[in-house]
Amino acid sequence: MKIFIHLPTWLGDTVMASPALYTIKEHFKDAQFILYGSFVSTALFKEFPNSKIIIENKLSRYKQALSLRKELGKIDLSFAFRSAFSSKIILHILKTKQRYFFDKNKYKEEHQVLKYLYFIENSLSIKAHFKDLKLPFKLKFQNPLILRNGKKILGLNPGASFGSAKRWDASYFAKVALNFSQSHDILIFGAGKAEQELCNEIYQILKEQNIKVKNLCNKTTIKTLCQNIAFCDLFITNDSGPMHLSAVYKVKTVAIFGPTKFTQTSPWQNENAKLVHLDLACMPCMQKTCPLKHHKCMKDLKPEKVIEQAKNLLKNSHL
């Protein structure tokens, strides 16, 4: 059997889709999988068993689909984890026998992990037994970037792909790092031009204070990003893809929420995570930039609140 899967676009969504993907894998143990999607989503599942990885060409996706129809031949089942109309066209071009499409308007108030699981359960008329986040990477827990002085590692992730509204202030991240700098060395994570500026700002603030810090922005692959986050003793992050990676590895995490719904995208089943957010009337707006122009959901969320939650995590030895 040959199964085509159109993965979610974003890193975090793809992580949250992992229980659903492994549910399909469990149900069709001997199937061959074609995993199709963005660079980050396909990189995340590059080592998925018995699979062929195809990166979507967004500039000519329909022409690509026509070529794939000839290359792949008969496809028995296809699942689109995207609700975009383009995904429907692609699966139509491939002429899959049975096609199933994720509907983002179903189960609107459920966590995103459950939305994806219900999609597969309803499509295949099965009950999912696997509900844990899982990635196919086999990580080596010997980090080549360890700062080698006996200190623990604090990871900072100041970026977020959805838009600037999700990003906590760089100076706030730096203040948190300064608070823990006696006991932790600092790793800064990020990707892309906008995040590079944030990461550089934090890096400069810390270097001026003679804090030991490594800026890994745009210096990791998806696999080494997973490796480094898994190695952290504490992780401070916005609502983002790396936040969901930290949930996979049960890293002690303080997750900062502003405009997004933490009930739907919180770190899934990570008992080592604490959520920090305000309760403003305008939250959650779900906008890329603040429509009210004040961005109070993030600006009024002061570093002291994050520091307090981080200290609570660290002092609870059972975590």
From Swiss-Prot:
Keyword Glycosyltransferase (UniProt): yes
Disulfide bond positions: none
GO BP terms, alphabetized: lipopolysaccharide core region biosynthetic process
Pathway annotation: Bacterial outer membrane biogenesis; LOS core biosynthesis
Molecular function (Gene Ontology), one example: ADP-heptose-lipopolysaccharide heptosyltransferase activity
SUPFAM superfamilies the record matches: UDP-Glycosyltransferase/glycogen phosphorylase
EC number: 2.4.99.24
Disruption phenotype: Mutant synthesizes a truncated LOS molecule.
Identification of the protein by name: Lipooligosaccharide heptosyltransferase 2
